[in-house]
């Protein structure tokens, strides 16, 4: 990735300010209208005060350097992956110079403080809706969660409620039938002494000696050892409506994202954006993917992926993606301290 950026930077040094403006205009116009862009169109939608012949010469240079291409003779130009990468990098510079106050995104004030699953669902759907893309959000690994409290609540002579509360407000509850009268308050106290502060993984791996072979360990295993889908998704319908993608493209994407190692390879430091061929999969060259991690304090606990057509609004998508990652990190950091 760094090698690609280095090559792009070297090519950009060969462009003057006017040629950069022409390239920016071509990519923006193509993203908006999805039609090849002519030199005349560049003059119509920009403030570049040069002749059409000058713009055509600039476009020839941009084509030679691999930023745009001409699908057929007499047609306008279409940006290549390299041209789209230029546009994204330019928009990133602009977004850093503008105030965050103009980010028209819904806030997370309505987030239910005790239900991280709903928080992730809300975040995924919000991200998908605002970017018109397909979103995958990795759930925090249940095994890494610390147990905060165990509760035994008698509800009748024969039944009691067994509840385990973990970090982020994740709660597991089950009714159990009792055949004898015991001091449930004392048992609850002992369970809390043994389990509080330990991770779910430690319990499931049998690292608590005094629980080995007990009915409570089997109960805990059945309660918190249940399998959960690693990812939740949102926005597949957005790709189905995108005129630059075919059903075959979307089927290919859904097949590729089943590969856990592939998804992990997309994530780097901060927000990583891969466009077309940069993704490294032939079948995904029509896509762009944004990826990044969300945190609990300094520790990453999950990844977020946004897949769109590579003909997309990179400026908007980057800002919304960054916003969602920051809000998720704030939420999980604050709830872990409660």
Curated annotation (Swiss-Prot):
Which InterPro entries does this entry report, sorted A to Z? GAF-like_dom_sf (IPR029016), HrcA (IPR002571), HrcA_C (IPR021153), WH-like_DNA-bd_sf (IPR036388), WH_DNA-bd_sf (IPR036390), WHTH_transcript_rep_HrcA_IDD (IPR023120)
Q: Name one GO molecular function term.
A: DNA binding
Q: Keywords in alphabetical order, please.
A: Repressor, Stress response, Transcription, Transcription regulation
Q: Which Pfam families match?
A: HrcA
Q: Name one GO biological process term.
A: negative regulation of DNA-templated transcription
Q: Which family does it belong to?
A: Belongs to the HrcA family.
Role of this protein: Negative regulator of class I heat shock genes (grpE-dnaK-dnaJ and groELS operons). Prevents heat-shock induction of these operons.
What this protein is called in its record is Heat-inducible transcription repressor HrcA
Q: Which organism is it from?
A: Thermotoga maritima (strain ATCC 43589 / DSM 3109 / JCM 10099 / NBRC 100826 / MSB8)
Supply the source organism's classification.
Bacteria, Thermotogati, Thermotogota, Thermotogae, Thermotogales
